């Protein structure tokens, strides 16, 4: 099942939306609860009378301390403004002297009603006793306070949800930072932690891919260095034998002096043969390292029947000239393969060189073509001749063939059983 891929932006937007919905629901719930509590406990008639009586006492004290008369309307307005949420009405001698709601045009005209008489309280002013009515929205301040607390609580819930939601991403980012420091310390075998499918996971995967590629590069370099060291050791050993023989034959020929003779000719012929063997070794070594320095072979799609037929025909003609018998079985298929023609020719040249050096001319050389829908193979087998020529123990020719086949996306296999030697050249069929 394909994973849903959320970017960090989408994740954050979704998180904020969820946090907003949850905090909004919590805010409305808290507001309903606090409103019910305030309405139940602070909106009763008893609480209203208690608060009114308390404000009457507070106002009476304010009047006494400032020796106010019923005409000090400015001072009354300042007190009302300071206390907030209340209405103040003052009567004296049955007439309205001050009202925090009405305009001054009504002062002295509005009379004290029976309702006002029943709900007013006596307060002593500097100019005599007056009747004072204080009405207040006493619970309003609690509604405002509850609203602020509810909003604060919902905001805290919103922040907690958002912080809790991004905590995992922050922890993962910290983990990536720590693992990068581990890699910087040289611990290249340490694997990066890959979690999820967002940008952070993509960064971690990119670093992990880079780590693996770097390790593969180091491994390839180490293998190449080990192969080069081994090859140098083997080549020094293989070149020592013909070189020693060459020197000995030249010394023998030198001792013969200027006189021509059968023994001198034999020494010269042997020296010439060893020189050719050394040249062959050096040529193979040069070709091998030349392949190593090249990057990629330029491949082209060719018809098997045309290209392989031409190459095989040329090689068989050479073998016939050298008095070898060749048996061919199988047919060349009507398929196509990707090859580099130059390197393919070098592959066949190396195969031919090995046959000329080591194949027994008294025995047949067998060449077999094998193919199916996916592959095309060339099987070559021969009997190894018994001679005083020591085969190249380093297998440099085989290594060159294997490397060129690999560069052409093919494969090379060889095996020796007793006196029989077998090789397989494998190519993958392609479409034109």
Swiss-Prot record:
One GO CC term, this protein: plasma membrane
Membrane-spanning residues: 13-33, 146-166
Catalytic reaction annotation: ATP + protein L-histidine = ADP + protein N-phospho-L-histidine
Pfam families in the cross-refs: HAMP, HisKA
Ranges in the topological domain labelled Extracellular: 34-145
Record InterPro entries: Bact_Sensor_His_Kinase, HAMP_dom, HATPase_C_sf, HisK_dim/P_dom, HisK_dim/P_sf
Listed PROSITE patterns: HAMP
Domain HAMP: 167-219
Cytoplasmic side: 1-12, 167-432
Keyword Protein biosynthesis: no
Enzyme Commission code(s) on record: 2.7.13.3
Gene Ontology terms for molecular function: ATP binding; phosphorelay sensor kinase activity
Signal among keywords: no
Role this protein plays: Member of the two-component regulatory system YrkQ/YrkP. Probably activates YrkP by phosphorylation.
Name of the protein: Sensor histidine kinase YrkQ
Species of origin: Bacillus subtilis (strain 168)
């Amino acid at each position: 099942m394909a994973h849903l891929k959320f970017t960090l932006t989408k994740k954050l937007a979704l998180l904020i939306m969820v946090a907003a919905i949850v905090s909004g629901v919590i805010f409305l719930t808290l507001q309903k609860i606090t409103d019910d509590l305030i309405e139940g406990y602070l909106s009763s008639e008893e609480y209203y009378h208690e608060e009114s009586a308390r404000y009457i006492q507070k106002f009476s004290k304010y009047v006494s301390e400032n020796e106010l008369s019923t005409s000090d309307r400015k001072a009354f307005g300042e007190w009302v403004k300071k206390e907030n949420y209340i209405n103040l009405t003052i009567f004296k001698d049955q007439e309205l002297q001050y009202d925090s709601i009405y305009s001054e045009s009504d002062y002295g005209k509005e009379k004290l009603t029976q309702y006002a008489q029943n709900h007013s309280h006596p307060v002593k002013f500097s100019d005599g006793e007056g009747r004072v009515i204080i009405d207040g929205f006493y619970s309003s301040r609690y509604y405002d306070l509850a609203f602020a607390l509810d909003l604060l609580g919902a905001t805290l819930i919103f922040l907690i949800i958002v912080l809790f939601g991004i905590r995992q991403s922050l922890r993962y980012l910290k983990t990536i930072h720590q693992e990068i420091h581990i890699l910087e310390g040289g611990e290249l075998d340490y694997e990066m932690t890959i979690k999820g499918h967002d940008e952070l996971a993509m960064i971690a995967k990119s670093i992990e891919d880079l780590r693996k590629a770097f390790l593969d590069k180091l491994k390839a370099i180490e293998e190449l260095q080990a192969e080069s060291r081994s090859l140098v050791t083997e080549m020094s050993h293989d070149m020592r034998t013909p070189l020693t023989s060459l020197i000995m034959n030249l010394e023998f020929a030198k001792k013969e002096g200027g006189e021509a003779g059968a023994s001198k000719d034999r020494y010269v012929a042997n020296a010439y043969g060893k020189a050719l063997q050394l040249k062959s070794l050096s040529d193979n070594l040069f070709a091998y390292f030349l392949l190593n320095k090249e990057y990629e072979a330029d491949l082209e799609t060719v018809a098997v029947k045309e290209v392989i037929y031409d190459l095989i025909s040329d090689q068989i003609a050479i073998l016939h000239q050298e008095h070898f018998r060749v048996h061919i079985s199988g047919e060349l298929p009507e398929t196509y393969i990707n090859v580099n023609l130059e390197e393919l020719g070098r592959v066949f040249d190396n195969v031919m060189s090995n046959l000329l050096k080591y194949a027994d001319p008294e025995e047949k050389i067998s060449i077999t073509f094998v193919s199916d829908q996916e592959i095309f193979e060339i099987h070559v087998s021969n009997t190894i001749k018994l001679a005083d020529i020591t085969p190249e123990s380093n297998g440099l020719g085989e290594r060159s063939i294997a490397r060129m086949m690999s560069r052409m996306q093919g494969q090379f296999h060889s095996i020796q059983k007793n006196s029989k030697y077998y090789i397989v050249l494998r190519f993958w069929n392609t479409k034109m």
